[in-house]
Amino acid sequence: YAPEAAERVIQFFKLLVFAQNRWAGKPFVLQLWQEEMIRAFYGVQVLDDEGNWVRYRRFLYNEIPKKNGKTELAAGLGLYHLLADGEAIPDVGIFAVDRENAETLYKAAKYMVEHTAMSQPPHRPMVYCRDSVREIRTRFGGLMKVYSNDVENKHGPSFSAILCDELHAWKGR
């Protein structure tokens, strides 16, 4: 177990703000169950073939009732993978049963970027949003983008992280 790996994710959330409802704009405070889930996923590591410590788990599945912060948590985790997970040029895909649902997650991440505690110089931001194509880009080539759930047509991207919202509603999953 590598507590520092999990703690890095938890500390990242302290830079973010909530994006929806009455908490919009307030600091993102993880609930205990969210912290424990992050610790269980990001903290458990194994040695790979090259002798590097890597995450043991590759899939994080979160199923809880509506209005419990799933979308905001997913948006924050997506931003973590885009900005802080250590990949040089990360590619984070946002998928949902339809484009409208995927855009809900994108809008939460966008709000977090635009209202974050991470200070960015206005003339050259590290992260910027492009609404016309529903994507968040980093100055270094990282990308977080909305895709349809038609996975068969998604040849090319080598995703660093994939965020799937409303998975229970997908046909043929």
Descriptions of predicted regions:
Residues Y1-R173:
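Phosphate/NTP-binding elements of NTP-utilizing enzymes
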